[in-house]
Regions:
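Receiver (REC) domain active-site loop signature in two-component systems and cognate sites
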Residues: 56
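Two-component/phosphorelay signaling modules centered on CheY-like receiver
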Residues: 12-30
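Active-site residues of response regulator receiver
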Residues: 53, 83
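Conserved acidic segment of CheY-like receiver
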Residues: 2-12, 18-19, 50
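Acidic, metal-coordinating helix/loop segments flanking the phosphotransfer/catalytic sites
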Residues: 32-49
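C-terminal output helix
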Residues: 107-116
Length: 121
């Protein structure tokens, strides 16, 4: 059975690029914000990996990560954070809070694919 990736990013172009490169090997569920992603998760869906942007409307990605890691239902799902911020302190903080990886935007799609494969296969 194909693995499922939940992608949360308010930029539709990121979703399209990720779907092109990851969609051949994985099922992708996309939401433009964390609120809709949480609603989907609370319907009983369990992805094998979550990829989330940090800067989003409604609920920031770091708040989304914190919610996931504090919730028994979701705490074991690996999360990759995406950001255009090159802040070392932010990367360290998010990794300490439970993110398994932090990828800077713009990213190389092949690099994303390799990082995803290392985490969920």
């Amino acid at each position: 059975m194909r693995k499922l990736i939940l992608l949360v990013d308010d930029k539709e172009t990121i979703a399209k690029v990720a779907s092109i490169y990851l969609g051949k090997d994985y099922d992708i569920q996309y939401f433009p914000d964390s609120i809709h992603a949480l609603e989907w998760l609370h319907e009983g869906k369990t992805p094998d990996l979550i990829i989330s942007d940090i800067r989003m409307p409604l609920m920031r990605g770091d708040e989304f990560l914190h919610y996931l890691k504090c919730n028994e239902l979701f705490k074991d799902i690996p999360v990759i954070m995406l950001s255009s911020e090159e802040s070392t302190s932010e990367r360290i903080r998010l990794l300490q809070e439970g993110a398994v990886d932090y990828i800077l935007k713009p990213f190389n799609p092949m690099e994303l694919k390799i990082r995803v494969k290392k985490i969920i296969e």
